[in-house]
Amino acid sequence: MKKRKNIIAAVILLMCCVAASLKAEVRYATTSVTDIPFDMPRVALPDIPANTVCITDFGAVGDGGSLCTEAFAKAMQTLAAKGGGRLVVPAGIWLTGPIQFENCTELHLERGALLLFTSDFDAYPNVSTVYEGNTANKKMAPLWAYRKHDIAITGDGAVDAQGERWRPSKQGKFTANQWKELTSGQGIAHKGVWYPDAKQDDEAGKEGKPDFRRVLQRPVLLEFAECQRVLLQDVTLSNSPAWNTHPLKCEDVTIDHVTIRNPWYAQNGDGLDLESCNRCIIKNSTFDVGDDAICIKSGKDKEGRSWKMPCQNVIIEGCTVLHGHGGFVIGSEMSSGARNIYVYNCLFNGTDTGLRMKSTRGRGGVVEKIYVDKINMVNIAGEAFTFSLYYANKPVAGKQDGDTSSADAVPPVTEETPCFRDLHISNITCQGARRAVYFNGLPEMPLSDVVLENSLFVCDEGADMHYAKNITFKNVKIQQKRGERITMADVKNFKEK
């Protein structure tokens, strides 16, 4: 009897060990970065079961005209009933409404597959989400997940969200011929802005009033909110109604060899907005967009501060940015803060600005421990490195491009005061920019503790700094065409070595 009990105990122990070993087989994302300047935790990859279904099994037709929304919903529900798995989309044009992910599911787009999301406004239910840092009532994102775990989009296929059927377009972004061509088709021009649709449900529609619902409620292309273990790999995500890709309050996010595209004129056409996420690797991806390309965010103002969720533990490596308002950007919605961010070995080619950090009074939040290394920049329209705490607000008098009006009173430091400190920028090579460096902090909260080293800037103008302290330049070469190499006002403890 005693021997039998021992055998049973041994079997139970063995089963526990096997279960523990299976549970421990977590796969992690890899990075080529070896000297990460902070304690970076590993980033877990999704665990997708081996079950596989094909979208054609559910009646979908890839002819670009047959609506496949119901087929995608049935496929996801079928996988969910099996505990998860992979949904394969073969070559073809698959017209569909929004796709909602279930736990442990992977959407795999084979080469030649195009997900074409319908422009039917009513195909997208309204959802409570976050946009520009605050709670908002918007249309559901075409690619949508809320509080799911282990989800992925993979494959060499592409996604087109038909953003031109949602976005307004400002006349100032177009040449005369481009504007004429845009406004000659469907849509309506109203006060220097082209809108994709006129309002049809009242008399105002007959007078050419735009349908502002479509504009105000337009969704981002991809929103994964409060999800764990997310993977985007190899796919092309393009033509979003608003922002392109928006992981929100997620953990363990990997974006690898992804192409993110929006038209250069796309209103609010950001590429990647990583908001209040933890443990992320963004690598070997390409961005060509209409607004900021790779952007770190963490909520806006009082609501954002209440999250207490900084965007943190992020590696961005081996990425290329073409058109975009900024190559790597922090802000302006950063009220929960950001820290432990490492940007390494990237190329910015033809971007409006290279490194862009922005906020304003009222935001609050602390941004610190930001590391940027080995960035090559070519043909930058504005600044190679710009920092301003006057985003969308008037700067202190005389501190930006000739403003000579009287200065406002300096407010006290409160939780609403944004703080940027402990920035380390190294090995920057910029061949062509309007200005090398522009710093504009707040009188009550200067930009502080910045090290810029081993860098070369070939530009029209040099460095211009205001309201900053503890700034160190080490082996920084600035070859400007005009003006002084460095100009400063209200800068304390500047050192050059």
Regions found by a protein language model. Give the residues of each.
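Extracellular/periplasmic carbohydrate-active domains that bind, remodel
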Residues: 20-497
